[in-house]
Amino acid sequence: GGKVEVQLVEYTNPGDHFNKHRDTEVNPSEMTRETHRKISLTIELTDNTQYEGANLRFIEDDGKTIRPEANKGDAFIFPSWRRHQVKPLVSGVRHALVCWYHGPFWR
């Protein structure tokens, strides 16, 4: 079995964001732990009329971004190696619950 890591994320100040990243290592030489994040989950906790900006975006290999329409209660499940970001908050407050499933390395 694996373990689950959970984090409550708050975007409360204008400009709060998360730069482009992956939730796990993709280069085998960087894999120093016995397990790593395999599956990522983001659950929206705030109605999208309560904030502007702070949108989750996925980045494709060609650099294009996908912005899923997100509202309170929506969940996004994706492989932890997928690049993504959260754009800067403009106004309001956004809360999300972020979870990662840890397991053995992909083969």
Model segments located where?
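Catalytic core of non-heme Fe(II) oxygenases with the double-stranded beta-helix
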Residues: 1-107
